[in-house]
Each structure stands twice: as C-alpha cells, then as structure tokens.
Amino acid sequence: MIKVLIIVFVLLSLFAGGDRTAKSLMTTAINVTIFAVLIELIYLGFNIVFTTAVAAILITAATIFYQNENNIKTVSAFISVVIVLVLSSFFIAFIITHAHLQGFGIVGDVKIQPSNGYEEDIGINMRLVQVAVFIVILIGGLIDTAVAICSGTYEIIRHNPNANRSEIIESGMNIGCKILSSNVNTLFFIFAGEFMIMCISFLKFYSWSTLINSKDFTQELIAIMISAIGTVVIIPISSYVASRFMCHGNVAD
C-alpha cells in the first residue's frame, strides 16, 4: 500500500507541476538520504552534535539551493536558517535537559524496559539524540518561512529600489506575520492528528493531568512548540539579513 501511495503521489506531482515538481521530488529524495545517513552515523557512534549539524546544513542547502537555485534570495534565506538553527540548538538543549525529555516513552502499550525484552541502555547519549530530533523537526518550518520572506522582500525592493533599510525590514516583518498563522496552524494540526488516537485511549483509562505529563505527549508537544517559536524568531532575522544583502543595489531589475 505504501508503494502504491508513493507512485500515486509522484505521478500526480509530475502531472501538476512538471519539471518544477520533479526538482521538489528529487530534493525530498536527497533529504531522505541525508536523514538515513545521519541515523546510520549516530548508530555507528559518530559525534551526534557534529553529524546533526552537518546533516542540518546539507538538508537546508539541498532544499533551498537545489530547489530554488543559487541567488541573492536563497543565500539570504540559507544564512537566516543557519543563524536560527545555531541559536535554537542551545535553547533546545536547555529545554530537553530541564524537562527530562530524553529517552524512550511507551511504544504502543509496551514500556521500554528489560522485562519486556527491550534494552534501555543502547550506548548512545539520548539527550543529544533528542536534540537532533528537535532540530530535524525545526528545519522545515524555518526554510519555508525564510524563503517566503526573502523572496517577498526581493520583489518589494525590485519594484521600489529607493526603499531604505528600515522600510525593507518592516516589509519583511509584514510578510512573515501574514504567513505565521498558516505555519503555526499547520504545526498544530500535525500534532493534533498524530496524537488524536493516543489522547482518546489515554483518557479512557487516565486523567487529563496524566496525559499532559506523559513523556510521549510532552515530547511531541514541546517539539511542535519549539518549531512554532523558531518560525516566529526567523521572521525578524530573515527580514534583517535580506535587508543587508538587498539594500544597496544588489537586486537586479
């Protein structure tokens, strides 16, 4: 069934978008490959922080440059995403450490423990793995927002070349605010759809407080919240970076 869905998706995408969609599909394939290599390297014992940083940069570069080509818009978006990823890494590590989000939760109805045939200690720093997970979750929203702001700012400057830097930043902020609600709603409904069945099954036997304090629920909720925060933070950063790159006659007519 999965193969059928993949084939249907690819055929419909190519029919709807042609060559442009083909590049998007190729970008997705590249990103899946990078993610698979990241998992394998972590499993083999490579430094989690370094491999995740390299993978995040490669995924960002593939998505922005391969799909949208190399120009002043994509360079601005790439730099903005990298800045937010660096800042977010420290914030994510702080949250995971103090919320004790690392480690296994419950897989189905089975808790990860030796009595169930599972090994709790797999020889990997689970705190760093959780940081890597949150960073990977964060990347998509950052890229979409940064590309939208930098592309919009580019068009504004192209049609109004006399705009000063403060006006350009304000325009970028306005663009970001317009797409913010859509991005946050998308993140929320991803979370709501994924955990609807779990919430129903939990509430059948446990209270709301037990549900909210469960590790599985908390991990996913905080991941979505961090993604939403990152989407907000990148708005002023993208606006500023775009203004720095595009303000002094760097935009072609």
Question: Where are the model-predicted features located?
Answer:
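Helix-loop junctions and hydrophobic alpha-helical segments within the transmembrane domains
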Residues: 165-177
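Hydrophobic alpha-helical transmembrane segments in multi-pass membrane proteins
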Residues: 89, 93, 178-195
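Short helical (or helix-break) motifs at transmembrane helix termini and adjacent helical loops
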Residues: 142-156
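Hydrophobic transmembrane alpha-helical segments of multi-pass transport and channel proteins
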Residues: 86, 141-145, 179-184, 220-236
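Pore-lining and gate-forming transmembrane alpha-helices of multi-pass membrane transport proteins
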Residues: 80, 124, 132, 136, ...
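Membrane-interfacial helix-loop-helix connectors in multipass membrane proteins
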Residues: 42, 99-124, 200-221
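N-terminal transmembrane hairpin
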Residues: 1-107
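Juxtamembrane helix-boundary/capping and inter-helix hinge elements in multi-pass membrane proteins
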Residues: 157-166
